[in-house]
Amino acid sequence: MKKLESSLKNMALALTGFSVIAGGLLGWVNNVTAEPIAQANAKILSDAIAVVVPGFDNNPAEAPESVEVEGVSYKIYKATKGGEFIGAAVESSSMGFGGELKVLVGFDPEGKIIDYSLLSHSETPGLGSKAAEWFKKGAKGDITGKNPGEKALTVSKDGGDVDAITASTITSRAFLVAVNKAFEAYKNQSANNETK
């Protein structure tokens, strides 16, 4: 086989050919994996809703509502049992030390926190990931049963009554900001439903 001459034209053709092949392969892989990824994410969300608002008999993930608070849109998943409203799960996020921290917070009809699930974070491994358990029932920073409408949740370092994660105050603040934002969305959604 004859060797091609090293010229600008031949290099451009070779680079274009490689780019087209690589782009086609990436597009194909994206097409093949998009549906399984979407299904896995839907299952993660459904499982998280079941943790933060247990005992429902509807499918809250099927018909989320969107509520806008201060220009930010929040998804709210209403849970019912026997047609009665038993609570809602609210997706919220805020910026922590390493990036976005995304949570799903469950509220009962009175606005008390039932539970939460840390959906994703970009915090320091080993520190930021502690938020997944630190604020759970019985843990050191337990927020379950609290109503952010009565008093916004803040860390004790800022005059609040929630213990921050050891060596991770910024993450703790970000987590509590996300929980407080979730409550605001929940409260606005509840107010909107009462006026309809």
Residues covered by each model-derived region:
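Flexible, solvent-exposed loop/hinge segments and secondary-structure transition points
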Residues: 2-196
